[in-house]
């Protein structure tokens, strides 16, 4: 059951959403003029709302002012709203600022991080609204610093090679989001807490990019064991996802029992079916072989020994 305070908050949010829905349908003047809550029983209540809808409005005209980098025709095409459409304030905001292909992203992806768009109703006649979108383009911004916080698993250059945002480049929102996805796909950081933070500096026309990371362990251990007629039956597999081959012979750099920090994967596994069957394997994977491009190198080796119970025949197999 909801507490009295929770119920009041739920009712308040519901009333807000109702007005928003009216606005989406063109009723920009819709207001709640009366509401009441009546207990239906011990567990339920009835909510009565009185709404004044007002007139339904349509777009009479849309114009952009202040835009010098892109023509009005291009901005109108991206906006996707035209004279005669229902005046939908939510859609207007989404197409200007929040959608992935919004007008703002045309600017943000080309360095204009100081961009702003202010829709203004310049004329309201009967049920028709003339809209003027006032653009503040600002200068193009270059990236000054790229700051990485919270990384305690990888060498910093291992993280930086995944980034598409580098000092001296024009700011691009697409590059920022792609860099975020690339870091998340590495598997070493919590994607839910991975929120990049642009820090604009209008005085210098630059922007710092800050990535706040939360490390997470993703090594894997698999173990199973039992007993059968042939003896101990078991399997052990160890997967290290942050291995560092270059530090293999440098124990002073080890974190734990193995060298770590390059994001390489080392997998060791072995299994036995008593004295009649044994198998061992080792594999290594480097997602950035050579360190300059994301070229994957995979190497593996396998060894097995099997004895035929009936004939005591022994066979050894290995490959790499």
Locations of regions flagged by a protein language model:
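Single conserved hydrophobic/aromatic residue that forms the stacking wall/gate
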Residues: 1-11
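Gram-negative/organellar outer-membrane beta-barrel architecture
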Residues: 153, 169-320
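Interfacial loop/beta elements and low-complexity acidic/Ser/Thr-rich segments
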Residues: 23-46, 51-63, 87, 112-122, ...
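Short, well-structured beta-strand/strand-turn elements
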Residues: 23-39, 109-123, 169-174, 181, ...
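Extracytoplasmic/secreted envelope proteins and their assembly/folding machinery
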Residues: 15-19, 72, 76-79, 93-104, ...
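A short, glycine/Asx- and small/polar-enriched loop/turn
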Residues: 40-47, 124-131, 202-208
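Conserved "repeat-terminator" motif of extracellular CCP/Sushi domains
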Residues: 47-56, 132-140, 209-216
């Amino acid at each position: 059951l909801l507490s009295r305070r929770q119920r009041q908050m739920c009712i308040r949010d519901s009333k807000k959403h109702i007005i928003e829905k009216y606005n989406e349908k063109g009723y920009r003047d819709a207001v709640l003029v009366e509401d009441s809550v009546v207990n239906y029983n011990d567990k339920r209540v009835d909510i009565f709302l009185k709404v004044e809808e007002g007139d339904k409005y349509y777009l009479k005209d849309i114009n952009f002012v202040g835009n010098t980098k892109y023509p009005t025709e291009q901005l109108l095409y991206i906006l996707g709203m035209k004279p005669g459409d229902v005046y939908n304030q939510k859609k207007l905001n989404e197409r200007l600022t929040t959608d992935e292909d919004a007008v703002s992203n045309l600017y943000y992806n080309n360095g204009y991080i100081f961009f702003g768009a202010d829709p203004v109703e310049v004329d309201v006649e009967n049920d028709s609204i003339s809209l003027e979108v006032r653009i503040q383009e600002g200068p193009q911004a270059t990236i000054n610093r790229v700051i990485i916080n919270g990384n305690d698993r990888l060498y910093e250059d291992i993280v930086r090679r995944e980034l598409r945002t580098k000092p001296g480049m024009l700011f691009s929102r697409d590059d920022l989001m792609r860099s975020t996805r690339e870091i998340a796909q590495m598997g070493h950081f919590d994607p839910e807490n991975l929120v990049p933070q642009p820090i604009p500096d209008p005085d210098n026309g630059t922007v710092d990019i800050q990535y706040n990371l939360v490390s997470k362990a993703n090594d894997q251990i698999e173990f199973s064991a039992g007993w059968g007629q042939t003896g101990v039956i078991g399997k052990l597999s160890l997967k290290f996802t942050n291995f560092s081959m270059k530090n293999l012979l440098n124990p002073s750099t080890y974190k734990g029992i193995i060298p770590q920090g390059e994001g390489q994967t080392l997998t060791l596994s072995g299994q036995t079916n008593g004295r009649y069957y044994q198998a061992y394997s080792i594999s290594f994977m480097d997602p950035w072989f050579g360190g300059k491009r994301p070229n994957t190198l995979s190497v593996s080796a396998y060894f097995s020994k099997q004895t035929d119970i009936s004939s005591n025949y022994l066979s050894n197999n290995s490959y790499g």
